[in-house]
């Protein structure tokens, strides 16, 4: 087991090395739109999981996740060599590449929130013109003082004064 702070620093360093190598040194066109988003290292520093996203060539095109995964698997040996040279640890961690689902999840959540906002706006629009059915408050009646009640109270007050 190693200090968690050291593991975090190593994970950050591995992510930087892999991202730099993909951008500048590996000439595989399948990796042109790959972005490294996060890196996790196990407590024994023997395994590193590198999370990545793939963007489309333009806004309308879908990203090619399959070819990007194949390109990363092919470049895994070169990337591990770069990590070993760049980190200086005794044992170079094995690299595992995992497609990051956070952007897709965030996009899905935004769609759900937009639908909820639209439903709230529709309810507010319908409620704006609505009026309650029946009386404003059918359960309460205003209290009305009867003349009979006033006469009954007068003698009782006079007895207390005596």
Curated annotation (Swiss-Prot):
Residues 123-162 are annotated as: Disordered. Residues 125-136 have a biased composition (Low complexity). It holds the Pfam family RBFA. InterPro entries: KH_dom-like_a/b, RbfA, RbfA_dom_sf, Ribosome-bd_factorA_CS. GO terms for biological process: maturation of SSU-rRNA. The keyword Nucleus does not apply. Keywords: Cytoplasm, Ribosome biogenesis. One of its GO terms (molecular function) is ribosomal small subunit binding. It is found in: Cytoplasm. Gene3D superfamilies: 3.30.300.20. One of its GO terms (cellular component) is cytosol. Belongs to the RbfA family. Monomer. Binds 30S ribosomal subunits, but not 50S ribosomal subunits or 70S ribosomes. PANTHER family: RIBOSOME-BINDING FACTOR A, CHLOROPLASTIC-RELATED. HAMAP family: RbfA. One of several proteins that assist in the late maturation steps of the functional core of the 30S ribosomal subunit. Associates with free 30S ribosomal subunits (but not with 30S subunits that are part of 70S ribosomes or polysomes). Required for efficient processing of 16S rRNA. May interact with the 5'-terminal helix region of 16S rRNA. This is Ribosome-binding factor A. It comes from Rhodococcus opacus (strain B4). The gene is rbfA.
């Amino acid at each position: 087991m190693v200090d968690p702070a050291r593991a975090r620093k190593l994970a950050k360093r591995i992510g930087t090395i892999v991202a730099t190598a993909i951008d500048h040194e590996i000439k595989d066109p399948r990796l042109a739109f790959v972005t490294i988003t996060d890196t996790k290292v196990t407590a024994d520093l023997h395994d590193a999981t590198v999370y990545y996203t793939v963007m489309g060539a333009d806004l309308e095109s879908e990203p090619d996740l399959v070819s990007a995964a194949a390109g990363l698997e092919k470049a895994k040996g070169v990337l591990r060599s770069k990590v070993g040279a760049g980190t200086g640890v005794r044992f170079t961690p094995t690299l595992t590449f995992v497609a990051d689902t956070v952007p897709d999840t965030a996009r899905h959540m935004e769609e759900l929130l937009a639908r909820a906002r639209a439903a709230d706006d529709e309810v507010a629009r319908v409620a704006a013109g609505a009026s309650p059915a029946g009386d404003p408050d059918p359960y309460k009646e205003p209290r009305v003082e009867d003349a009979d009640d006033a006469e009954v109270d007068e003698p009782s007050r006079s007895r207390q004064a005596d």
